[in-house]
Amino acid sequence: MLKTSLCDLLGIEKPVFQGGMAWIADASLASAVSEAGGLGIIAAMNADANWLRDQIHELRAKMDKPFGVNVMLMSPFADEVAQVVIDERVPVVVTGAGNPAKYMKAWNEAGIKVIPVVASVALARLVARRGATAVVAEGTESGGHIGETSTMALVPQVVDAVDIPVVAAGGIADGRGVAAAFMLGAEGVQVGTRFLVADECTVSEQYKEMVLKANDTSTRATGRSTGHPVRALKSPFTNAYAKSEGSGASAEELGAMGTGALRKAAKDGNYEEGSFLCGQIAGMVNERQSAREIVDDLVDGAEHVLKGACAWVA
């Protein structure tokens, strides 16, 4: 059985995190992943405290295993969401889109295990000094907000830079990716794109079909001029956004253009106006499965690869 120190640290059976994808990672998906032995994560996104509290209660009504909440630090509700995870005794907080330092003391004092998503060695070192339990080193292959460094390059550098467990994210969709991440020094993986087509994922049918039909060149990154690049499946929206960006549109204009685009994709299935966030690995996601089947396939596949690799060493 594939088990690392991270499993013991978090009380999970399998070293697989489900990505905290906004408008996607809700109680339905998160509870299914946690029930399968991984770490299911609810995405707080730009929602207010009441929405998050309801999602936490819904998840706990389904199961009693460890789970996490992803706090998007750019959210206008970040302060109140940061308090909700304390009030609700959330066991794990994963942070994204910023530096969580201002909240970490309170979270640590509440006994919450804090795992920031980082795209650089510098941020990994900073949050480790502030008391992070672990970090998610996320490469540019990921869907959604991205950095500039690939997973293959980022993960080993972060592993060497900090003395806490590292979770690899970006471009991982099967056991080979999991095994590769472990060989780079990671103690777990975070997977987003493959869970988009999980049976328990509540995204629109349009979104799922686009992921299933994607190939290796189906995504593009936009928004670099704003300082907040995003990777999504190519669509009329990404084409229009890239055209505006290339024409010199301001960050404010681009921000207004993107407002609500992810919701239109995830909930409405609006092909023309939706932003279908997705990682470069989408071309390997070819079938619908339950969350349990996905978690088991990731872990079993990694075990098979790692055992087979031993035969290469004389």
Describe these PLM feature segments.
Residues 1-165:
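Active-site entrance/lid segments in N-terminal catalytic domains of soluble metabolic enzymes
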Residues 153-167, 173-314:
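Conserved active-site-proximal phosphate/metal-binding subdomains
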Residues 22-23, 38-49, 136-148, 172-207:
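Glycine-rich phosphate-binding active-site loops on the catalytic face of alpha/beta enzymes
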